[in-house]
Amino acid sequence: MEWLREPYCISTDKTKLDVGMIHHFLYTTAYWAVGRPMSIVRKTIENSLCFGLYEGETQVGFARVVTDYATFGWMCDVFILPSHRGRGLGKWLVECVVAHPDVKGLRRILLSSRDAQELYQKYGGFHALHYPDNWMEKFTETPFRKVKPSDLPEENKSHR
């Protein structure tokens, strides 16, 4: 599926993805994925519905949804390269992701963001969890991402 806004295009065609660029941005810049190895990036792409944002043939943004294609999705790894920010591309990317036929029918889509909640609220229809006390998460240390006490919510720091 493709969306066009000259000179930009958003595509779900995984063969167009510049996996090297995606890996470089996530590995070096994305606070949620710094240090993520190429092998993990490849595996996440293989197992997700991916959205590449391109200027001509050059990829300048990315997003993916981990989903069962029936009831649930997790939107993640959303970014626009710094040189293309301020042009409404993040807004457009979020709008396209939530409008995709395989996403818009899902009962629940989650995401996590420490700095773009307003964008996701306005352009994706997201809001804070209705019942945050019902949700749980599990942090797992991996070779590329060690859980630090600073990663945990304030109330959990004493339990580490």
Where are these regions (language model features)?
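A conserved beta-strand-loop-helix scaffold within acyl/acetyltransferase catalytic domains
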Residues: 39-79
